Amino acid sequence: MALNNPNPTIRVLYATDSCVITYSLMLLTGQESSEDAYVISYDWSSELDDLFGSQPRVLDADVGDSWDTTDQSDEELLAAALLERKPSVSFCLLSGIVGGASDEPQERIRPMFVCAFLTLTGARALTKTLLHGHPISSKILLQALVDGDTFQLHNDLILALAITLDNATARTGRTAAAAKYDPQRGSVKAAILGHST
């Protein structure tokens, strides 16, 4: 199986029974929720077209094939293929960004967290979720959560919060040569570099 991209991707639009923001924040802080997540819709990168975009399987009555056995075997095959290819799965919410002066098309969804399902249990749970709409537990999502990729999505917000909460200020002085940083207060530069002065 030759792959064009070593990192195939799946984007999932998800929902929960209660507040999806609270659920997402719980995941981002490593807390397991008693609620499950539900997949509303999903799409995939072209590297996974052979898995998701294939023609429906034709039943072979001569070997006793039935829809039940087809569903089960297709589910296992997809789980095995997902485990082998290790796609990056972005869980997204609808975006609130509308309009704007740019000619660029606006994304209608915003990724909240990224998962990689690297265990057979995780790949099976993802498969059941995608194929049959089964809910996926927060425990499975926490096990699959990719911290670095997830927090990179929110880096701008994290930086803005750090600057605000640390009461950071820009340097004093009008030129680079005259720049001074107040050692009593955090600086924007320190917040960007990830440490305080």
UniProtKB/Swiss-Prot annotation:
A GO BP entry: DNA replication
UniProt KW keywords: DNA replication
Role this protein plays: Involved in DNA replication.
Family, as annotated: Belongs to the herpesviridae UL52 family.
Protein name: DNA helicase/primase complex protein
Protein's gene: 7
